[in-house]
Amino acid sequence: MTTKIKVKTSESDWHKRWKLYYLRHHGAQLEVQIGSHVCDVLLPNGQIMEIQRKPLTRHQIEARELEYQDRLNWVYDSQFFLNRIVDQRNEKFSNEDFHFLPLDYRFKFIGKTNSIVFHREPVWIEHKMSFYRLITWQFNGRYYGKFKERIDTY
């Protein structure tokens, strides 16, 4: 049986494969209007997956965070974000910047494209820090844990 999913015609195969994955394996809803935004994937547990292949502006990130709160997760294509995601493991975190930590992770259904998933760390929201941690269930040898103002690699 072939599963068809309704996606924007401008979306890449990478986007479509991710959406199909969540639809088939997690029973997700796609392209759901929540407030003023349309989220890519809405999981049955209420978590939202935003699938992103190009950098967003700070305003675009903050607008989604304001709308989705702590339900927001990001799936990034690390092939395209190689020079745009900042690994700040040994530096202080700034309120002015968003920090993303890359992890090499390969999904069989995605093919050669490495992808990474991030979720907002609630404790850092309270302290007005803009930091994303890796979701640990997507683990392939390197995990970044967060402790105060530094990140240790396991």
For each feature predicted by the language model, list its residue ranges.
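Acidic-basic catalytic patches of nuclease active cores, encompassing PD-(D/E)XK
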Residues: 1-33, 43
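Structured beta->alpha junctions
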Residues: 33-34, 53
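Beta-rich catalytic cores
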Residues: 37
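Conserved catalytic cores of phosphodiester-cleaving nucleases, focusing on short active-site segments
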Residues: 41-57, 68
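Hydrophobic beta-strand segments of well-ordered beta-sheets in folded domains
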Residues: 46-48, 70-75, 123
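Mg2+/Mn2+-dependent nuclease catalytic core
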Residues: 55-82, 86-89
